[in-house]
Amino acid sequence: MVRLKNRYLMTEVIWHDNEKSTQLSDSWLFQFISNEVKEKLGELTYEAFKKTLKIIYVNPDTNIFIIRVSFEYYKSLWTALTLITSYYGVPIYFRMVHVGGSIRLCQKAAIKIFGKQISVYDKNKILRNEKGETIDNNNNKNEEPSIKMDSDDDENGGGDDGEDNDSEMKD
């Protein structure tokens, strides 16, 4: 029995004009990619891997999608996606986030990438709190006077008790 080897390409669609961007969907992506591959690489190349081309996952909020293609043709698809520069006059760019042999590897890569982005949002929240800004339930920004007391260390013995506090600084 022959094992079919596939590659899963996790790709991000970057719209350079957000006002003219389109909502991603399975059918739109499949049609658009099919037409662009025919135009960029030729109909013969497209026909060679058309049967193995499948959209596995689409997230319109993050503009991320996972596409499956046969191992033999994943470099051709990667090349075609790289060559796409516009969608009806709107500048567009496909960024290859991860190439893997299974969906599980793509999921792990997505968790790793989005985990870093989530920590950036937490950092912004911390910076807002340091400035004394708060956001209420209606997403209104309120500025409160920030009171920073440096004398807390002096009350607790100055924080100079000879112990290293590096264990508290771990990520």
From Swiss-Prot:
Residues 141-150 have a biased composition (Basic and acidic residues). This is Probable ribonuclease P/MRP protein subunit POP5. Transmembrane segments: none annotated. The keyword Kinase does not apply. Its EC number is 3.1.26.5. Residues 131-171 are annotated as: Disordered. It comes from Dictyostelium discoideum. It comes from the Eukaryota. It catalyses: Endonucleolytic cleavage of RNA, removing 5'-extranucleotides from tRNA precursor. GO terms for molecular function: ribonuclease P activity; ribonuclease P RNA binding. Component of ribonuclease P, a protein complex that generates mature tRNA molecules by cleaving their 5'-ends. Also a component of RNase MRP. GO terms for biological process: tRNA 5'-leader removal. One of its GO terms (cellular component) is nucleolar ribonuclease P complex. Its main location: nucleus. Keywords: Hydrolase, Nucleus, tRNA processing. Belongs to the eukaryotic/archaeal RNase P protein component 2 family. Residues 151-171 have a biased composition (Acidic residues). Pfam families: RNase_P_Rpp14. It is an enzyme of class 3 (hydrolase). It is found in: Nucleus, Nucleolus.
